[in-house]
Every structure is written in C-alpha cells, then in structure tokens.
Amino acid sequence: DIVLTQSPASLAVSLGQRATISCKASQSVDYTGESYMNWYQQNPGQSPKLLIYAASNLESGIPARFSGSGSGTDFTLNIHPVEEEDAATYYCQQSNEDPYTFGGGTKLEIK
C-alpha cells in the first residue's frame, strides 16, 4: 500500500495568513501525466469534503483561497487567506493505486 505522511500534524495560523500542509507519498502517485492526489477537509461529525483533486484542481464550489500543487511523491495544500471557517482537519488521499489511502491528517487551528 502507498503510505502518505502529512506534516505538520497540527498547525495554528493567524486569521488572514497562509496555512501550508505537506503530504509525502512512499511512491509516486503519477500516471500518464496526471498526479492522483486529492485533498479533503473534515469537520467533527461530518463526512470529508473534497477540496482539491488531481493535485491542483479545485472542486466545484470550493473557494479559490484553497490551492494544491506538487507531483510524484511531494504535494502541498495552501490556504490563503485563512478564514475562521477553515478550522478543521485536512487529509491528503492518493487515488492512483488500490487501496486508496489517506494521510494521518493535519488539524488546523485559527488564532
């Protein structure tokens, strides 16, 4: 299975500043020029919400302050400017190889 390592595990960012979350895969999640890395936001008691798919594509309805980048094994989620409603736990997920796997999560706190 592909192991995804997220960092940091928790993050406190001031309102209006930038939050940066990293995800490193144990092997490449690229295939035919596409990076099969996705990012989700989860609030307590709710299902995860897809933010970014294929490394850098913004899901419909998601604010443009969310952006994703990376390829191969190294990926980044940026949130800028951070808003209060962004306090949540964020997960990367690879969809290149079964079983699809998730990172351990990053809990974002807004100061």
Curated annotation (Swiss-Prot):
CDD domains: IgV_L_kappa. Pfam families: V-set (PF07686). Residues 39-53 are annotated as: Framework-2. This chain was isolated from a myeloma protein. Residues 93-101 are annotated as: Complementarity-determining-3. Residues 54-60 are annotated as: Complementarity-determining-2. SMART domains: IG, IGv. This is Ig kappa chain V-III region CBPC 101. PANTHER family: IMMUNOGLOBULIN LIGHT CHAIN. Disulfide bonds join 23-92. Residues 61-92 are annotated as: Framework-3. Residues 1-23 are annotated as: Framework-1. Keywords: Adaptive immunity, Disulfide bond, Immunity, Immunoglobulin. Residues 24-38 are annotated as: Complementarity-determining-1. The keyword Acyltransferase does not apply. Signal peptide: none annotated. One of its GO terms (biological process) is adaptive immune response. GO terms for cellular component: immunoglobulin complex. Residues 102-111 are annotated as: Framework-4. The keyword Disulfide bond applies.
